[in-house]
Amino acid sequence: MSLVEISGSDAMAAPMPGRVPPPPPRPPPMPRRLPPMFDAFDHTGAGMVWGFPRPAKKRASLKPLHWVKITSDLQGSLWDELQRRHGDSQTAIELDISELETLFFVEAKPEKIRLHDLRRASYRVFNVINLSMPLPDMMTAVLAMDESVVDVDQIEKLIKFCPTNEEMELLKTYTGDKAALGKYEQYLLELMKVPRLEAKLRVFSFKTQFGTKITELKERLNVVTSACEENLLLIHQVRSSEKLKEIMKKIPCLGNTSNQGPDRGKTFLSPVEFKLDRLSVKRMHYFCKLKEIMKKIPCLGNTSKSNPRVGVKLDSSVSDTHTVKSMHYYCKVLASEASELLDVYKDLQSLESASKIQVKSLAQNIQAIIKRLEKLKQELTASETDGPASEVFCNVCWFFVRLMI
């Protein structure tokens, strides 16, 4: 066999004739290192985020540790140094989860029992929370009818949010733990401690506003008294006005002319046989309108004489259109036939004051006060049988009644 010259690495790799080649060397072992404390970096411009080792799955809710992420330049900071040392082996802190759960366990709140509609309950509880004091203290002030503590607006709000009969019945039939009930149910239970709360609140509201109502009523009564004196004077003026008598005497002429016809029957009247049913919506209103129209008569008269420059648009504010037309036409006739009667309103100087009397409205206000006094009497009678729960309320009521008398 001829020898072949082999050089370099090939000479080392070539097996010697007649020998088995040695096995290849084992690969080097993988480096063994513990998981680092900071094992991930996220470079985001000026700041960076380092990921902590994922903790074991929590078995209970723990109180959170709140921190704020740093977004400014970290160069030269402690966090920058930790980043540069990232290649060093870092050992994660081993935490005792059981101890953490013992120290920082968040106790789950017991679920409240709701017996009523959640939307209605939330709205009412929100308004009650906005009251100026705790509800028990306010109920104490209500029973004492203390106006220095509870104002009329708060009273009206409490009246609005008084429990209904259905709500009270639902709570009365509940046999479970009342401490486990929701806020709205607790609110209702507090209100239900006061017997007939709504009736007492209405008495309290009446007491609060009584002084103002009586003052306003006295002022209106004085106006009525003065107006009645004016009314008596007006009656004298009406009876003594010769011009008004002449006007009234001429009205049947218009009516008899309008009532002519084969199917109307005998409707002719003498000057003293008619009432102002068509020429007035209300008697006082008629006289007031008559006064206004009389002042406009010259314009109406000029219009009838075809002088459009001084014409006037007729007033149509009265609900009865036919009445307005009849009245205006009659005034127009007076302007043409008896112009000396046009200043009749000068004989009725008390007309305007007397027309402002609102006896019906005044009577309604007086009647409303009488009804509320009757309600006060009923609640006072019922409260006297409540015992200690309404004792303070009864004492204040009796004191208020004595002041009114």
From Swiss-Prot:
Residues 1-31 are annotated as: Disordered. It comes from the Eukaryota. Residues 52-405 form the FH2 domain. Residues 18-31 have a biased composition (Pro residues). Gene3D superfamilies: Formin, FH2 domain (1.20.58.2220). InterPro entries: FH2_Formin, FH2_Formin_sf, Formin_homology_domain. Belongs to the formin-like family. Class-II subfamily. This is Formin-like protein 15a. The gene is FH15A.
